[in-house]
């Protein structure tokens, strides 16, 4: 169990318990020790002064722990109606949206993601002032309308530890102040970000004048090649000149220039537009 008062994670594993007890260990040191141990059985022993021995095969670590009496346990959350989605879907959704959250606290809401439940649909939204990511998931059941903002840190940690099985589910519980994710033998409890999220629908146009269909890999490879001429921190845009059946991509920097044509299908007007290549790759 770990808890920083904003995010708490509890997991249960099988083992041989010779004597029950509680001890608090430095999370970083403990995780690094376990990560570097051989793939074999691990023994953890402690004494009355909280000195702890962690051994595995021929490796043995001695570290100092603390009493678990003062440990801040994960708050009890009453679990009412659960929202059920597959582990695979949740992990995929996080990966497809987490890149466009803000990485600073200038606007707290931008450091999280909107989870909006409406009947049998879950909408997940993130934005950082430059990009907006939206993913819609169809749910098996109908639910009352709810909107919460989940910290990006919470979703990043879940993405790291969730197995992501297609046939394995995640149960999500919502309260006024917390969100709970239950999967396998792990429970994640997180505080929510307070405040009214941005009105995304008002930011997006409903009458686009140009629609382009393009091979994703071909476009990605082309933009990736263009970044060879852009140094880190340089804000040179990649220019896209869209005409019937063709998209010309070009970039100019003090290093040099590059242009490439890609076959496309286009509906609507021709357009000349520029984008940050890194944002577009993301």
Functional labels for PLM-detected ranges:
Residues 1-282:
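Structural preference for solvent-exposed beta-strand-turn elements
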